[in-house]
Amino acid sequence: MVDFGALPPEINSARMYAGPGSASLVAAAKMWDSVASDLFSAASAFQSVVWGLTTGSWIGSSAGLMVAAASPYVAWMSVTAGQAELTAAQVRVAAAAYETAYGLTVPPPVIAENRAELMILIATNLLGQNTPAIAVNEAEYGEMWAQDAAAMFGYAAATATATEALLPFEDAPLITNPGGLLEQAVAVEEAIDTAAANQLMNNVPQALQQLAQPTKSIWPFDQLSELWKAISPHLSPLSNIVSMLNNHVSMTNSGVSMASTLHSMLKGFAPAAAQAVETAAQNGVQAMSSLGSQLGSSLGSSGLGAGVAANLGRAASVGSLSVPQAWAAANQAVTPAARALPLTSLTSAAQTAPGHMLGGLPLGQLTNSGGGFGGVSNALRMPPRAYVMPRVPAAG
């Protein structure tokens, strides 16, 4: 604790006059008054709303819990507002004490003047004539010392009394349950577990009912319908290819049938020619078999496993007929026997014909005019009869 009596008046007066004054204390008192007024207004409004709800539209146990939770907060606001108001009053007391101490404090210029006068008296006191004046000056300085000390002690006592009346502020009470968030999290987790358990209990009977039902088809009707829609656009080109194959097979069968008939006619009197016809027919059948294998490999082993591919305007021509490339290549190796040999003997034609005269082509070449077996008519022509039996009139 500072002993103001031990300090000279120069120090005490300088401290008092060098401070900010009472203006800061007055401003602080006004702010505390404003805080107190706001708290009183908030407490009054809060209390009015609470009582308005509980006495009017909201009645019940939940309303009672709300009042029990809100009442401590309203009380805290009221108490805090009173404390703020008291603080403002005490700050004003301190400001008044300062003004009193300031008025009692000797001004520093007066003290400085006294000290200057003392120095002059001492300097001119050659024969002791200034001794009474020096004593008076020292007495005045002593009074200044005592006055400043009394002012400072009075100010310290007044401010101490003002601060002792103040009460410490308290924190606002909790109006909610601190464990509410934890309890809410636990409740949510329990609700989720309960919902999952309920869903499981609902799904188990459904699963058992599905197991109890007869086994359904692996491919439902709608899936088969979608599969048919995907396949059906490719069936039309496939059917065209099959139709073309059937036409060529029919042509081959017709040619083979004609060759078989010709073979039967020539077998009796021209064995070599018959053998040539049979060989040509077998070659034609082998050519169609090779064509069928090529078509089957292009369509895939399953018939629908590979994509359908087609080209337009790429077929080769044999005469006026459009044929595959293999047939066109084979057609170049065909050498009609009638064009290569004279029409003197079928035996020589059969012996000199190539082994693969048809070269994998349909038997339509057998009907070429002026070639192939066009000379058969000459071989079958009967010589003129040596004797003609006359017709008997009695025979009718």
UniProtKB/Swiss-Prot annotation:
Any GO BP: response to host immune response
Disulfide linkage: none
InterPro entries cross-referenced by the UniProt entry: PPE_C (IPR022171), PPE_dom (IPR000030), PPE_sf (IPR038332)
Domain of life: Bacteria
SUPFAM superfamilies for this protein: PE/PPE dimer-like
Family assignment from sequence similarity: Belongs to the mycobacterial PPE family.
Protein name: Uncharacterized PPE family protein PPE19
Biological source species: Mycobacterium tuberculosis (strain CDC 1551 / Oshkosh)
Gene that this sequence comes from: PPE19
